[in-house]
Structures are given as structure tokens and as C-alpha cells.
Amino acid sequence: MELSLFARRFGGDSGVIDLMRDLGEAVSIHPDMIMMGGGNPGRVPAAERLYRKRLGALLDDPALAHAILGVYQSPRGDERFRAALARMLRAECGWEVGAQNIAVANGSQSAFFVLFNLFAGEFDGGRCKHILLPLVPEYIGYREVGLSDGMFHAGRPAIERLPEQLFKYGVDFERLAPDAATGAICVSRPTNPTGNVLGDAEIARLDALARAHGIPLIIDGAYGTPFPHMLFTDATPHWNDNTVVVLSLSKLGLPGLRTGIVVAREEIVAAFARANTILSLACGNTGPALATALLDHGELLPLAREHIAPFYRDRATRALDALRHEIAGLPCRIHKAEGAMFLWLWCEGIPGGSHALYQRLKQRGVLVVPGRDFFPGLIEPWEHRDECLRLSYAQDEERVRAGIAIIGDELRRSYGG
């Protein structure tokens, strides 16, 4: 059987496919595996109780149940949801948006597939454009979504070494140079995998840079503000008519509902909705229906701020303390935890590299993610990307502590301690 170039691109191996395969095998074949690799959110009891209550009420109403189960959404997504979300964004964030500025997708992964291919790839006259990533490491799922080669360009970040075996990445604005072949600038805030949060001043500089080059700034807010608000530092919500913000319900504890949200000026939303209709026909109804109920009852933001954020802040603090204890005396550093649900461990000069360390940990029953695939668009050789691991602390706290102890033991063995 001969397969197309499309099949080679999307049917072959990639970092995100390896990640999801590991997660699937861990659940079905190795159920005792300590899961510190994937992006599944933790279980927040207050959130789960609220979701059961609101979903139950929706399904008990015959008209609402039919609207969820028996009809297709419009191409841009459910009108009531988009209007309710726009009202909240105007009231809470001061964004000048209406329902016409919002589109729904079947998860933010599919949203980025459409967005990146709207702004980058092949253009008239044989020209090609790329997405500029000002700060890598970046989300592993970006790496393979382009329909053409060379979809991403990135450069090394600035690295600030901090006390207590911490460090922090920053945008190296001196080396950041969009050009005529740049179709858009994209950042995640907080950043998956590192937990980095770009400051307001950095976002303002990126916004000005994008405007100066006539290209949009895309902000991946899957972990950010205004929801799910997995932030441990101050960060002002940012949007204007040159910004595309992508939000998600997944990290509220709802990854199974596959609901991504695009907030942009109307012409971008219209183009996105047309492309998304061709690819998906329509989006699922359950996520928007549940989110509308939460918005109508004024529950979405209090849930994020009073339950989701404290849950992850506490988990981050405990995991950071445990990991710092394990790496004491080793040439390792942890990225400053400012948000999201991961610790990013830099094992400087680790013998054999982080992929070999990942394999050894997997053999010992701990699933993490090696760092190499989190550097999309970075062409130049850099040993740093083979020295890092992403660790999730979202799952059962005792198992996370046990996993961190095994990681520490394996690191000491690796360094000959």
C-alpha cells in the first residue's frame, strides 16, 4: 500500500504521538505506572461536584438535553455560549468583544491546527511563511501540525540562573527578529512545559513587535487567564484586535469534553470557522452547554480562582520542595514554577541525555516526558534540549512524591553518586 505525503507527515512518529501512546499503554497495560508525563488535569473535588450538578440539571430538562444531544452547532459554535462568554470577557477583562469575536473548536489542539495553517505555510507566488515562537521550550503539540515543512522558527531563550537550584527562561529580544516570512508570533502563557509566565511587559513588547510587522500575536491560554487561572504570579489578561487568544475547558478538569475557544477579530474568526467546518463539520455541544450554565450562574471564574488555582499552587509548592530535596548537590535546576501543572527539570550534562533517563525511569515505573520534542523550530544544535524532563504533579500526591524519589535516585545513579 502506498500512502500520501499527508500520511507520512501525520501518520508517522512524533513527540505528541509518543506521549499519547505512552499514556494509553500506561493506563491499559501498566496501570501501576506513576503518571508524571501526561497533561491530564488533577481531580478537584469542588469542581467535580459542580460539574455533576450542572450537567444533571441540563440533562433533566428535555429541551436542553435535546439541544446538547440532538442538534449540530452552528459553524462558529453555540450562540448562547459565545454571547455569555463575551459578556464575561467584557466585564472581567475589559476586552471589547462580542459573540462575533468568538469561535468554538473540538479542543485547542484542533484550533491550533487551523490557526497555524491560516497564517503560515505556502502562499501565492511560491512564498512560504512560518510561525515565530519567541520562547522555547514550547508545547509539544505544536510541532507536527503544519501542512508544510519549516512551519516554525525559534531561537534560544535567555536563561537566568536563580538561587535554590532554580532557573527561568526569558525572551531574548535582542535576537528576536520577525521578517517578511513570519506569518504570526505565538506564545503560551503559562508555558507548557516549563510553567513559565511571560510578564505583562514582555507581552506588551511582543504585541508591539507583531503590530509593527503587520502580523497577529497568538496567545495560548490553555492554562492561563481568565480561566482556568492556573497561575502563581500576576498576569494581566491580554487581548486586542491584533491578538488571537485560545482558551480551553480542559484544564478546568474537562479534557473529555474537547472544547477549545478562539477569541479574535471578526475576519479571523470567520476564516477560522469556515476552515473548522470543513475539517469537523460541527463542534460538540456538551462543553459549551456546561460552560454556559457556569457562566449564567456566575460560577466559572470563582471556581477557577478559589478552587483550581489554589489546588495547583499547593501541589506545585509540595512537588517543588520534594524535587529540590532530591537534587541537592547535583548539577540540576528546576524552572521557576509560575503556573500550569508541570515542573521542568534541567539535568545539566546528564550522561546519555534525558531520553535515556526517561527510558530508565519508565523501566522503574515512572512515566515522564523527555525534553527534546519541546523545541519546535529550533534548528541550531543545543545540548540543553537533551538535558531536560517535564514532570506533571497533577495526579495523586503520594504517587507523585514516590515518583520524585525514584527520579532523584536515578539521577544520583546517572551522575555516579
Locations of regions flagged by a protein language model:
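N-terminal "arm"/small-domain region of PLP-dependent enzymes with the aminotransferase-like
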Residues: M1-R76, R87, A91, H213-I215, ...
